[in-house]
From Swiss-Prot:
GO terms for cellular component: mitochondrial inner membrane; mitochondrion. Its main location: mitochondrion. Residues 65-97 are mitochondrial intermembrane. Belongs to the TMEM223 family. Mitochondrial ribosome-associated protein involved in the first steps of cytochrome c oxidase complex (complex IV) biogenesis. Stimulates the translation of MT-CO1 mRNA and is a constituent of early MT-CO1 assembly intermediates. It holds the Pfam family TMEM70. Associates with the mitochondrial ribosome. GO terms for molecular function: mitochondrial ribosome binding. Residues 1-43, 119-202 are mitochondrial matrix. The chain crosses the membrane at residues 44-64, 98-118. This is Transmembrane protein 223. The gene is TMEM223.
């Protein structure tokens, strides 16, 4: 029977083996580009862009109509001008307030649609060498926009199994999270989890 002091290196190796195999693959040299994520929703974002543009035009026209002075009917010289009080919807205060409100709603709809389009990720590609990653977003009207950043500047804020719908991705130097829809395709889940899907302190 082996002595206890001879068995502990074997037990220690058995404990450390999963940790060694789960280390990030940042040092692994890739010979070619590898697709890590893909989710093409070009048609949806085209419709979303048209909807937001239509809403912007509608609310802008409402703001212009509100600020325009209504025509004043011709009245006899001896006619008495009625006092409508401060709640008259034709007063300047109400018209300018309504114009500002309509403009704010239109800007909010346009801004939300633009931001969602620019932060919804269509594909993630790990470049050859494993040190650069290219993110492609849907962009307004589904036209697509891409950029390449060092892998060390990308941090996944949650594991794929921890979120129900959207996977938040943080890129250093860029505001707001980039969103990966979990219904998309992950061709290489292990490589994704060890590279782009890993958490980093940025």
């Amino acid at each position: 029977m082996a002595a206890p002091w001879r068995r502990w290196p074997t037990g220690l190796l058995a404990v450390l083996r999963p940790l060694l195999t789960c280390r990030p693959l940042q040092g692994t040299t890739l010979q070619r580009d590898v697709l890590l994520f893909e989710h093409d929703r070009g048609r949806f974002f085209t419709i979303l862009g048209l909807f937001c543009a239509g809403q912007g035009v509608f609310w802008a026209s409402m703001a212009v109509a509100a600020v325009s002075r209504p025509p004043v009917p011709v009245q006899p010289l001896d006619a008495e001008v009625p006092n409508r009080g401060p709640f008259d919807l034709r007063s300047a205060l109400w018209r300018y307030g309504l114009a500002v409100g309509c403009g704010a709603i239109g800007a909010l709809v346009l801004g939300a649609g633009l931001l969602f389009s620019l932060r919804s990720v269509r594909s993630v590609v790990l470049r050859a060498g494993g040190q650069q990653v290219t993110l492609t977003t849907h962009a307004p009207f589904g036209l697509g926009a891409h950029f390449t950043v060092p892998l060390k500047q990308v941090s996944c804020m949650a594991h794929r199994g921890e979120v129900p719908a959207m996977l938040p991705l943080k890129v250093k130097g860029r505001r707001f999270y980039f969103l990966l829809d979990k219904t998309g395709h992950f061709p290489n889940t292990k490589l994704f989890d060890n590279t782009v899907g890993a958490y980093r302190s940025l």
